[in-house]
Swiss-Prot record:
In the N-terminal section; belongs to the methyltransferase superfamily. tRNA (mnm(5)s(2)U34)-methyltransferase family. In the C-terminal section; belongs to the DAO family. One of its GO terms (biological process) is methylation. Residues 1-239 are annotated as: tRNA (mnm(5)s(2)U34)-methyltransferase. The keyword Cytoplasm applies. InterPro entries: FAD-dep_OxRdtase (IPR006076), FAD/NAD-bd_sf (IPR036188), MnmC-like_methylTransf (IPR008471), SAM-dependent_MTases_sf (IPR029063), tRNA_MAMT_biosynth_bifunc_MnmC (IPR023032), tRNA_MNMC2 (IPR047785), tRNA_S-uridine_synth_MnmC_C (IPR017610). One of its GO terms (molecular function) is oxidoreductase activity, acting on the CH-NH group of donors. GO terms for cellular component: cytoplasm. It catalyses: 5-aminomethyl-2-thiouridine(34) in tRNA + S-adenosyl-L-methionine = 5-methylaminomethyl-2-thiouridine(34) in tRNA + S-adenosyl-L-homocysteine + H(+). It holds the Pfam family DAO. Its cofactor is FAD. This is tRNA 5-methylaminomethyl-2-thiouridine biosynthesis bifunctional protein MnmC.
Length: 657
């Protein structure tokens, strides 16, 4: 189980310095946190000069603390007219402050500085501050040009699980004598695996143990004058005297032309369009229907919420990461003027038995889930909130709800602006890569419909076929929805899920569903499906009577989910199955990082019923992989959804030839 997050306690010394009672050490120099950040970390890493004329620049910090190093770096980036296009700041923190404590600490520090541009940034940071849950949290500022990737957890555990290429290291944290683990050889070896060949570092300490650990990990150091009269601090470069890593950190996809094809204009594809366009890519979106979001993404509404499991398994962690990331992306779209229809009053998940409710309640307590993510609801509380009878209690997801998938897809395409070209009513039959390295999307006649440096297949169950994948087992699952006329179902004020779901729509109409019918290809709504949905609704909300309505007279809709055999999505760079077959004998014990890849070919499919939760995170992962940016989730989670995972399993069992 993932360790729960224990927040930091905010304490000020008499001189105004923020201090940690847990570690018995100060968060910053009494001479000034922001001035220290500038002298030690910014100037110590040769910034801002080193990020100039770079498309993207990545900094890793080993302790976020009060956020002053990030705030000072952000302000320096803003003040530099020649700054890099995109600044990535990745920071690890075992004990993050709660939002309002962070606001107080940073505001207090800023109040004693003459660096005036920083003051407005404090509220921006605090307002974006995430729920204190383990894992990776990505925040964007300045229209996405500045990205803060927070990693909540023990650095010893999380640093080896990051995927990125670092250009500078801010080695901060409590003194080695107070928190020796953060300065251990294991930490520096993890950092060395993430370092760009030109990476630099800076730290306020000149401890002998730190110097030895740096040297062992391949970092060359030198002493320079410290901050505020301190005799010495350390700066240096990554300069290994030997080969220190089996796998190089990720690089950007190399191309002179930043154009891409996305096949499939549902939730998966439109999310990718928006993320690539935000990075300056010109995208051609190809959809076989006459309009976007016409298939499963064309449902009147979909629900969104994280999954919670007592053991905090991979699926639960992925859903939590996807849910929180989606909320951030949707808010950014709304701030940019690309509004779409979604509920904002929460979502209730009801248990199907008293025993299940007890397990749900215990899971919340055991995991330390913050109330802003989920809280337990007794049966009486659920009755009062939903204004109708329920059989059992459950969970309240305060930020969950329902959304119009088609409206979201339209907002994402609108955000792409003139970087998006659409081709509709055309079905792609296959892909081929030319001698010039560019991909061509061909129709059934062999005509080239579009060509680009990069292709993302996001067309659900057809993706594997178009990409020529033999080792990507997916299945179509029929899902029938039922629309209930006004007044025919309990008027719940917010979406309710459990065994099925009920969503209040406009004009008093209620949406309920959905059936789960593997390998059924009938696209016509059936009376039996409506009857099944009505019976499920009756179990969910006992005040409803399934026999009160004529199932044969109801309206509905059929969509088809695409589900992988392990129920996780397929997201990221695709494996080169032909190359793997040629090298099969050498790859029997391969890991995912050893598998040959289809250069410039990516996938975003197999989202099943969780497209709203997973699509935004999947799109961000693909965009980060293409542009060589820090990944927005742990490598362990990225590998769990790597499309090549099935190829690796086949190689291990000798099934690739």
């Amino acid at each position: 189980m993932t360790d729960r997050i224990v927040p930091a306690t905010l304490v000020f010394r008499e001189d105004g310095t923020v201090v940690s009672p847990l570690y018995g050490d100060i968060y910053h120099s009494a001479a000034g946190a922001l001035a220290q950040a500038d002298h030690v970390f910014i100037r110590g890493n040769g910034l801002p000069e080193r990020w100039r004329h770079e498309r993207a620049f990545t900094i890793i910090e080993t302790g976020f603390g009060t956020g002053c190093n990030f705030l000072a770096t952000w302000a320096a980036w803003r003040a530099d007219p020649s700054h890099c296009e995109r600044l990535h700041f990745v920071s690890v923190e075992k004990h993050p402050f709660a939002r309002e404590d962070l606001r107080r600490a940073a505001a207090h520090i800023v109040a004693y500085t003459t660096i005036t541009p920083i003051a407005p940034l404090v509220d921006e940071l605090a307002n974006a501050w995430p729920a204190l849950t383990p894992g990776v949290h990505r925040l964007e500022f300045d229209d996405g040009r500045v990205t803060l990737t927070l990693v909540f957890g023990d650095a010893l555990d999380v640093l080896p699980n990051l995927a990125l290429r670092a250009h500078a290291f801010y080695l901060d944290g409590f003194a080695p004598s107070k928190n020796a683990d953060l300065w251990s050889p294991a930490i520096f070896k993890s950092l060395a695996k993430l370092a760009d060949e030109r990476a630099t570092f800076a730290t306020y300490t000149s401890s002998g143990a730190v110097k030895r650990a740096l040297d062992e990990a391949g970092f060359a150091y030198r002493k320079v004058d410290g901050f505020a009269g301190k005799r010495a601090m350390l700066v240096g470069e990554f300069a290994p005297r030997w080969r220190v890593r089996r796998h190089e950190p990720p690089r950007a996809f190399s191309t002179d032309i930043r154009d891409a094809i996305v096949i499939g204009a549902g939730l998966a594809g439109c999310a990718v369009v928006e993320r690539l366009a935000a990075r300056g890519w010109h995208v051609t979106l190809i959809e076989r229907r006459e309009r976007i979001a016409s298939e499963a993404s064309g449902n009147p509404a979909g629900v969104f919420h994280p999954m919670i499991a007592r053991d905090d398994n991979l699926a639960a962690r992925l859903s939590r990461a996807g849910f929180l990331h989606a909320l951030n992306r949707w808010r950014a779209l709304e701030r940019a003027g690309h509004a779409f229809s979604r509920s904002t009053h929460g979502l209730v998940q009801l248990a199907t038995s008293d025993n299940e409710f007890e397990r749900m309640r215990e899971s919340i307590d055991a995991l330390g889930v913050p109330a802003e993510l989920a809280s337990a609801l007794s049966r009486d509380d659920a009755r009062a909130l939903l204004r109708t009878d329920v059989a059992h209690g459950g969970w309240l997801f305060a930020q969950g709800g329902s959304i119009s998938p088609a409206a979201l897809a339209a907002a994402q395409c609108a955000a792409a602006g003139d970087r998006l070209s659409r081709i509709v009513g055309v079905e792609i039959a296959r892909l081929e890569r030319g001698g010039d390295g560019r991909w061509r999307a061909l129709d059934a006649s062999g005509a080239t419909i579009a060509q680009a440096s990069v292709v993302v297949v996001a067309n659900a169950a057809d993706a594997a076929r178009i990409a020529g994948l033999r080792h990507a087992p997916t299945q179509r699952v029929r899902g029938q929805l039922t629309l209930l006329p006004p007044g025919s179902a309990p008027a719940v004020p917010l979406p309710v899920i459990g065994d099925g779901y009920v969503v209040p729509l406009a004009n008093g109409v209620t949406l309920t569903g959905a059936t789960y019918e593997p390998d059924d290809t009938d696209a016509t709504p059936r009376e039996a499906g409506h009857r099944e949905n009505l019976e499920r609704l009756e179990r969910l909300l006992p005040a409803f009577s399934a026999n009160a309505l004529d199932a044969g007279a109801l309206a509905g809709r059929v969509g088809f989910r695409c589900v992988a055999s392990d129920r996780l999505p397929l997201v990221g760079e695709l494996g080169d199955e032909a190359a793997a077959a040629r090298e099969a004998a050498a790859l029997t014990g391969a890991r995912l990082r050893d598998v040959p890849r289809a250069t410039g070919l990516y996938g975003a499919f197999g989202y099943g019923s969780r497209g709203l939760v997973w699509a935004a995170l999947g799109a961000e992962l693909i965009a980060a992989q293409i542009d060589g940016e820090p990944w927005p989730l742990e490598r362990e989670l990225a590998e769990a959804i790597d499309p090549a995972r099935f190829l690796v399993r086949a190689l291990r069992h000798g099934r690739v030839a």
